[in-house]
Amino acid sequence: MQDAITSVINSSDVQGKYLDTAALEKLKGYFATGELRVRAATTISANAAAIVKEAVAKSLLYSDITRPGGNMYTTRRYAACIRDLDYYLRYSTYAMLAGDPSILDERVLNGLKETYNSLGVPVGATVQAIQAMKEVTASLVGPDAGKEMGVYFDYISSGLS
């Protein structure tokens, strides 16, 4: 896992040079949004279960996927879906705090699409639920933090699509 600081420093280090203006501006932007990120993470942490619950209600609960024969039918499959969505929310929050999506590749996306396909998990419905979670989260944390979190939800959605 990297953060925005490590990413900028490593890039300059590999090139054997001091931080240039563009690198310093990137760091300045990261630090300027630090308080916003921490407030958003605090709100998300305090409301994680409600965020997942509302996202499921908005995107999956009343669709064919939860009816007999659907991929979320049976309590075990439903619980696995909730667990996965909570996992995506948590790791998106980590990525938002770090200002870098690398943790999403390392801990979420590597091999996930293949695993879902082999288990018959509907990727489209998963992406729909992630997008619903993006909307619910933005409504709680406000437009600026919501936009920032949206980057990481979209990153996961794109990685699954």
UniProtKB/Swiss-Prot annotation:
Q: Which UniProt keywords apply?
A: Antenna complex, Bile pigment, Chromophore, Electron transport, Membrane, Methylation, Photosynthesis, Phycobilisome, Thylakoid, Transport
Locate the residues binding (2R,3E)-phycocyanobilin. C81
* Maturation and modification: Contains one covalently linked phycocyanobilin chromophore.
What are the subcellular locations of this protein? Cellular thylakoid membrane
Where N4-methylasparagine occurs, the residues are N71
Q: Name one Pfam family in it.
A: Phycobilisome
Provide the topology term for how it sits in the membrane. Answer: Peripheral membrane protein
- Which GO biological process categories is it annotated with? photosynthesis
GO CC annotation: phycobilisome; plasma membrane-derived thylakoid membrane
Q: Which residues form a coiled coil?
A: none
InterPro entries the UniProt entry points to: Allophycocyanin_b, Globin-like_sf, Phycobilisome_asu/bsu, Phycobilisome_asu/bsu_sf
Subunit structure, as described in the record = Heterodimer of an alpha and a beta chain.
Hey, which family's this protein in?
Belongs to the phycobiliprotein family.
* Family annotation (PANTHER family): ALLOPHYCOCYANIN BETA CHAIN (PTHR34011:SF3), PHYCOBILISOME 32.1 KDA LINKER POLYPEPTIDE, PHYCOCYANIN-ASSOCIATED, ROD 2-RELATED (PTHR34011)
What does this gene product do? Light-harvesting photosynthetic bile pigment-protein from the phycobiliprotein complex. Allophycocyanin has a maximum absorption at approximately 650 nanometers.
**By what name is this protein known?**
Allophycocyanin beta chain
Source organism per UniProt: Anabaena cylindrica
**Name of encoding gene:** apcB
